[in-house]
Every structure is written in structure tokens, then in C-alpha cells.
Amino acid sequence: MRRASPRLVSRSKPLAWAVGSVALSLAAGCSAIGPAGKPTPLAETLTGARAQVPTATKKPGGVQPALRVGQFVFYADVPLEPSDPLFRELDELPERIQRELRLPAGNNIVQVYLFDSQEKYESYMRDRFPWLPARRAYFVSDGKRPNAAEDLQVYTWMGEHLRTDLRHELTHAILHTVLAGVPLWLDEGLAGFFEQPPANDGLNPDHLDKLRRGGFTPDLARLENVKLVADMEKPEYREAWAWVHFCLRGDDRARLVLHDYLQQLRANPAPGLLSPKLRAAVTDPKASLFEHLARQRNPE
């Protein structure tokens, strides 16, 4: 893999658009580890992470000043331009999520570590979290010090998917600050919704195309039983996104069910399954989901 150029974050070029063609071997995805290394249903979350082995590759920071953007603090070993459109967009992400999901604001600081090459990122993640599958980015929460600034971290690298990956991981972080827990499928579905550019209104063109090609059999009850990220493959991520998009954009009754469920999750990490609540409000959720997907048009 070729190294990302420092021009990614220079004062003359926008962060997201100065990236050339980069070959990727990492897939988007999530992981959750409990305090003793036991998997939990929180997406892309590692608790008790600080107890792991020291790393040979250092995480970014110390060479350049950190950049504070709202509740996010960015660290990199190359200069970061505060006026970059990416940072302006990320500064608006928490309010966008709060408004859409009817959730309160969280005040936790999220530390974001931007490696300047894929090699450095992979090396650090292999050394620090050797049991994790390869992913382009991770959200990490250390449960040892609740509400401390350093507890919430995002790790990623400056590749061509940086903008999408940061929206995705920071969505996890924002949800983590206000919810007591969130089912894996819902965590991923919401992150998949908000990882899209605001102009897309949560619509993922790639997911939509693949789901409409045929062979898609939605089964929310099955998806709700997926507890480990290792069992979340691309079809599961697509279906999770589809259900969230349907709830938020396809049916007013479904949106109310989701909003109520999220309110329950603020105090109760396990308020039961969403699927029975959805069936009680929507006569045929599967048929309604198909109709919703059929009506969508990819953004131009």
C-alpha cells in the first residue's frame, strides 16, 4: 500500500479530496470487547483497552498540535487545516444525529487518531488489539474511567474512505455518549445511515443497488440475534441499514417505534427486541420494507 501524502491535510488542499487512488485490504466493520475480552453487543467498542500490550508503532499526536472541533479532538503527525470542509461537516454531525433521533446532546470528548498511512494504522492495531479483525477504522471505549475525556477514541487512517469512515465511527461515539447500550444491528444500521453525506439523506446507493437486484430476504428477528461482529457480514450490514432507513424515512409509525426504542435505550441497555414492537405498529414490516426500497432513487 502506498503511503498517504502529507498534502492530505495541507493548507492548500481539502483533506478528503487530496487523496489519490489507494489499494485497500481492510473492510468496514465493527468489534466489541468487554472488560475481560468477552464480546459484547456494542458495535466497534473496546472496553478495558488500556490494559493491553504496549505497541511498537505510536499513535499520532505530539508532533503537531491537536485540533479541537466541537466535542472531537483530532491528532495527526501532519498539519490539520481547521477550515477543511470535512471538519466543518463533522462539527455538525452530533446535532444532525440528535435532531434525527430525538436524542439529547452528549458532552463527552472523543479523541480521533488519524494515521498518515495504512501501514502505520495496521501495525498499531495489530500490536495494541491483536485479537481484532482487520477493519479500516475502530471506535474504542475504555470502560475503566467512565466519562473521562480519554475514554472514547476513534482510530483510522487517511485513505480514500476517510470521510465516510469518520462519519461512521463518530456516529458510534455519539450514540455511546447518550445510550446505555444499543443492539449490534441497530448500532451498525444507524452508523450506516449517518455515514452518508448529508445530501444523501441517509441513502446508501451501493446498498440500495445490491438489495434491489433480487435474492434479498429481510429477517429482522434473525438480524437481532446476531451478537458478535464476526457474524456481521456485508449482507447483515446492508439489511441493518435498510431497516434503519425504512424506520426513519419510510413509515411514520415505524419512526415513532424507533424513537421510542431509542428513548428506552437511554436508561435500559436491554429493553427487548425491536421487531415485535415494529410488527405491532406496521401490519407487514417486510412488505413495507420492500415497497420503501423500491421507491428510493439514488442521489445524483
Question: Model regions: which residues?
Answer:
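Short acidic, Pro/Gly- and aromatic-enriched capping/linker segments at domain boundaries
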Residues: T45-A66
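Bacterial Sec signal peptide processing site at the extreme N-terminus
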Residues: A28-G48
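Positively charged, low-complexity intrinsically disordered regions
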Residues: R3-A4, L8, S12, A51, ...
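Acidic/His/Gly-enriched intrinsically disordered linker/tail segments
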Residues: W131-T156, E160-H161, T177-E300
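Sec-dependent bacterial lipoprotein signal peptides
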Residues: M1-C30
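Soluble, non-membrane globular domain cores that form compact, hydrophobic packing
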Residues: S31, Q52-T55, D252-A254
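Internal hydrophobic scaffold segments of catalytic domains
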Residues: C30-P35, I109, F115, E188-P197
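Juxtacatalytic substrate-recognition/specificity segment
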Residues: G61-P183, A267-L274
